[in-house]
Amino acid sequence: MRTTVGAAVNAASHFRQSQVYTAPKRILRNIRRGQFTRLVASLHPRCHQGPNKTALNRYPEIFAAAAAAAPNAQRILSFGCSTGEECVTLANYFPHAQIVGTDINPLNLLKARKHRSERVRFVYASDRFLCGFGGFDAVFCMAVLRTWKRKRVAEFYPFDRFAERAQFLESLVRPGGLLVIHAATYRFGDTVHRWTYETIPVAAHQRTKVYLPDGVTETTPESCIFRKLKPVALSAG
């Protein structure tokens, strides 16, 4: 009898140390820590970065410069809005604008919707749906188009992937509107679409290191605010 009890105790101890027992507990622990949102996002084919850290007024110099450059903006997109704090911030800087926040992470959107108001709304990041808005006066993409890898950057996040998403975002900007891309792995200025925009200067702000298209060479980022040039009408003569 004593041997049977001892064997049962040992079996229970081994079970508690097994993956079958520990894996669900580890997943639940990560959910409580907020790390589950990173897992959900990383499994999405259009995910560009894992961490979803955000805060109110996270980039005050950039927001102020953009507001000065587009004081009459009526519709603004926060691409990769995370849990919504950026949208609240933009609503303060652009008092006359409707703010649309979008994210691919449904858990982020659940948290973001507590910030909904008459001027702030949140939607799932469907390209087709965003195209249906008819353009934006400003598109903000802050710390989204990036990888946090420090080695083999081109392998984990090639420049072509960045350029493809940058092309989509710039297609949403109305002529005369702003495209704001900050804390990205690469520079918008190295894409072919750069020549249809002019640079808006920004007061001194924190600049993160970026890479050239080879994904190896580190370089200094340029200004992160760009104004889409209006088409030039050619005279018939």
Where do the protein language model's features map onto the residues?
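A short glycine-rich, Lys/Arg-flanked "PGG" loop and its adjoining helix->strand segment in the class I
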Residues: 155-178
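Conserved Class I S-adenosyl-L-methionine
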Residues: 189-219
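Conserved SAM-binding motif I beta-strand of class I
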Residues: 98-103
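Conserved SAM-binding loop of SAM-dependent methyltransferases across substrates and taxa
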Residues: 83-96
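A short acidic, Gly/Pro-enriched loop at the edge of an enzyme's catalytic core
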Residues: 128-143
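Conserved SAM-binding loop
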Residues: 112-113
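Conserved SAM-binding strand-loop segment of SAM-dependent methyltransferases
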Residues: 117-127
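Class I SAM-dependent methyltransferase Rossmann-like catalytic core
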Residues: 31-72
